[in-house]
């Protein structure tokens, strides 16, 4: 059993809060202390939202979970918070699959797709570091992706099974080895790595699952622990002497032997009932398949205490009733903690959509005898469950979504940029001769060594425009949905370094596109109402020019839509607030000088697996099948638009056009 130690949060920064940051910090902190459940920080681009969040955490002093909508963004936040809080525990918790293909079954072609997952060791270590930190001290900030609402083992079991070693403790060597095996550590005297231990005479060396290079050397004298030291596992260098060390389990799905026996009995009982059901329905192939697969897993559990895909039996292993809420990272926090949701207008819809997508895939596996019905309980939280488990939330967004607006009585605004930078000037120009006009504007920026972003409505237009610009001698690249995360980051870096002067794309709202060198953002077809030109996405796009003191936006349009009017008025309002502040304090706007943070190497992963449209269109279809496909795509498109994933929505819209044209 470990005791949680108390440490205050300490910010390391050369800056003090300024502009309207102090007011925003004060309002949010007072709201939290008064027990407010929902608060929203409406922070314009470049106003230092991360710094405000850090100051709120410091003032409130609670363990905090910060949820971002993908691994890349979580990685950027992790780097920033680690810089602000070097003395505190800043942790990182994302899905640990480098490449993850969940198991699935396609009935029409009778294809079973095995789970194919290569676990990324670095991320696995960081996940263990995050969960163990919560049981060791209270100054913990965990940056997580939405995967934090997926099932995890029972936190009480995880905490109770900690192997605690203390100098002077009575314990013989074989007892320690037995305890380590119970918590899923394996003995390996040759290939010493995380989650293993090795034995040399009276010395046991343990490589904790939560550490990167540090192992623990426990020296025995008879039946007593004589000495505990932290050692670098590669060099063998002794780092420091320890009086005490807590070794957390090597797996989050660890179960005591007596509980495992009960779990196995429960699984056998469920298997028996399900086989009867399938045979009564004359589903003999499915029954045979289920019997074979489940019995193999049970055999592995009896022998090894573990099996591949053990998470599918989590409801039995944690002895929960069927259909009950799964344990997640949220349960590892105590009673008094804080949740911050970054880019909440994108992250919350993701949290909301996780359960349904997961359920649909697993239901097919259950129906066809690949899994027991209880596998449906290894799932992400439903949105209502997420709401139940979280006590106090701060939503952070430049354009809060409907949920935040509905649940927050008063927005905490952060409009003023400490740098004095103004929101960009916006000009609306007619579409006639727009491309020639655009080229001359680009030329002006190139001469000043500045960069340009151009956003279009369709993939074809992006491609044609890029080709046209290349022929005109402009250094341009096209950012589209097929580009993988790593390449995407490289293209943005190349833009900053001047390899390119222009980037063309459909959705330039995704992470990492806050580029100070960009002085011009061009919005083509600004008057075409739709999800790509809604007031929220227009404001976000305009914000991309707000990090440069010469920032301008040109909208090409032949009429003024409501969305355009709202975005232009809101930008002007923010511009005036900033101008007054600058005048009062004698601030001259200056372009941000922003260094590029190193991301955790492991964050540059297959985010793109989730970017592509899920719907595959078969070549030949009946009229009925075609209509069903159209309905499905329409549904998916609306969801993607709601989630601000406009590239995916556009791809789906193009599919719809094709289908309707063929019909």
Curated annotation (Swiss-Prot):
Principal subcellular localisation of the protein: cytoplasm
Keyword DNA damage: yes
Binding site for ATP: 43-50
GO biological process: nucleotide-excision repair; SOS response
Domain of life assignment: Bacteria
This protein's UniProt keywords: ATP-binding, Cytoplasm, DNA damage, DNA excision, DNA repair, Excision nuclease, Nucleotide-binding, SOS response
Domain named UVR: residues: 627-662
SUPFAM superfamilies noted in UniProt: C-terminal UvrC-binding domain of UvrB, P-loop containing nucleoside triphosphate hydrolases
Every Helicase C-terminal domain range: 434-600
One Gene Ontology term, aspect cellular component: excinuclease repair complex
GO molecular function, one term: DNA binding
Compartments in which it is found: Cytoplasm
Pfam families found in the cross-reference section: Helicase_C (PF00271), ResIII (PF04851), UVR (PF02151), UvrB (PF12344), UvrB_inter (PF17757)
Similarity comment: family membership: Belongs to the UvrB family.
Protein task: The UvrABC repair system catalyzes the recognition and processing of DNA lesions. A damage recognition complex composed of 2 UvrA and 2 UvrB subunits scans DNA for abnormalities. Upon binding of the UvrA(2)B(2) complex to a putative damaged site, the DNA wraps around one UvrB monomer. DNA wrap is dependent on ATP binding by UvrB and probably causes local melting of the DNA helix, facilitating insertion of UvrB beta-hairpin between the DNA strands. Then UvrB probes one DNA strand for the presence of a lesion.
Subunit structure: Forms a heterotetramer with UvrA during the search for lesions. Interacts with UvrC in an incision complex.
Note on domains (UniProt): The beta-hairpin motif is involved in DNA binding.
Protein name: UvrABC system protein B
Organism, as annotated: Staphylococcus aureus (strain COL)
Gene name, Swiss-Prot/TrEMBL: uvrB
């Amino acid at each position: 059993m470990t005791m949680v130690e108390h440490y205050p949060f300490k910010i390391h920064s050369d800056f003090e809060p300024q502009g309207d940051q102090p007011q925003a910090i004060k309002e949010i902190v007072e709201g939290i202390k008064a027990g407010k459940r929902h608060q929203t920080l409406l922070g314009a681009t470049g106003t230092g939202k991360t710094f405000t969040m850090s100051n709120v955490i410091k003032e409130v002093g609670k363990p905090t979970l910060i949820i971002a909508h993908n691994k890349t963004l979580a990685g950027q936040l992790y780097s920033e918070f680690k810089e602000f809080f070097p003395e505190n525990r800043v942790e990182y918790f994302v899905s640990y699959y480098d490449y993850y293909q969940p198991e699935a079954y396609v009935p029409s072609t009778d294809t079973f797709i095995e789970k194919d997952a290569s676990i990324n060791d670095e991320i696995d270590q960081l996940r263990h570091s995050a969960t163990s930190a919560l049981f060791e001290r209270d100054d913990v900030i965990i940056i997580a992706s939405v995967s934090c609402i997926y099932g995890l083992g029972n936190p009480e079991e995880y905490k109770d099974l900690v192997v605690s070693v203390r100098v002077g403790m009575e314990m013989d060597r074989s007892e320690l080895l037995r305890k380590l095996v119970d918590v899923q550590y394996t003995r390996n005297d040759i290939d010493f790595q995380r989650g293993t231990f090795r034995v040399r005479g009276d010395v046991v060396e343990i490589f904790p699952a939560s550490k990167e290079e540090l192992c623990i050397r426990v020296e025995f004298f008879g039946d007593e622990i004589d000495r505990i030291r932290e050692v670098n596992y590669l060099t063998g260098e002794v780092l420091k002497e320890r009086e005490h060390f807590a070794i957390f389990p090597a797996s989050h799905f660890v179960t005591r032997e007596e509980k495992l026996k009960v779990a196995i009995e429960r699984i056998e009982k469920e298997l028996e009932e399900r086989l009867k059901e399938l045979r009564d329905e004359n589903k003999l192939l499915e029954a045979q398949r289920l019997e074979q697969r489940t019995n193999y897993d049970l055999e592995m559990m009896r022998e090894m205490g573990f099996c591949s895909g053990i998470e599918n039996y989590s409801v039995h292993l944690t002895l929960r009733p069927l259909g009950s809420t799964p344990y997640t990272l949220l349960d590892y926090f105590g009673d008094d903690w804080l949740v911050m949701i970054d880019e909440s207008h994108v992250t919350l819809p993701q949290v909301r959509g996780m359960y349904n997508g997961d359920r649909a895939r697993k239901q097919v596996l259950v129906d066809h005898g690949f899994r027991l019905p209880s596998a449906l309980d290894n799932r992400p939280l439903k949105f209502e469950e997420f709401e139940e488990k979280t006590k106090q939330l701060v939503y952070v967004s430049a354009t809060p979504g409907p949920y935040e607006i509905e649940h927050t009585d008063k927005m905490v605004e952060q409009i003023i940029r400490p740098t004095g930078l103004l929101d960009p000037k916006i000009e609306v120009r007619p579409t006639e001769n727009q491309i020639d006009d655009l080229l001359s504007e680009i030329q002006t920026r190139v001469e000043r060594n500045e960069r340009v972003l151009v956003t279009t409505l369709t993939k074809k237009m992006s491609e044609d425009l890029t080709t046209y610009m290349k022929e005109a001698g402009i250094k341009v690249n096209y950012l589209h949905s097929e580009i993988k995360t790593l390449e995407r980051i490289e293209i943005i870096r190349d833009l900053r370094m001047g390899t390119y002067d222009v980037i063309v794309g459909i959705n330039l709202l995704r992470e990492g596109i806050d580029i100070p060198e960009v002085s011009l953002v061009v919005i083509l077809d600004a008057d075409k109402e739709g999800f790509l030109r809604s007031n929220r996405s227009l404001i976000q796009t305009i914000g991309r020019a707000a990090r440069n003191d010469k920032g301008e936006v040109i909208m090409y349009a032949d009429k003024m839509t409501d969305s355009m009017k709202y975005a232009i008025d809101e930008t002007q309002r923010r511009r005036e607030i900033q101008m007054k502040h600058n005048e009062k304090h004698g601030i001259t706007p200056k372009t941000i000088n922003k260094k590029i943070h190193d991301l955790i190497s492991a964050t540059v992963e297959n985010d793109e697996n989730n970017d592509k449209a899920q719907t595959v269109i078969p070549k030949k279809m009946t009229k009925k099948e075609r209509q069903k496909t159209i309905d499905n795509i329409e549904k998916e498109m609306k969801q993607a638009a709601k989630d601000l994933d406009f590239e995916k929505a556009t791809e789906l819209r193009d599919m719809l056009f094709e289908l309707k044209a063929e019909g």
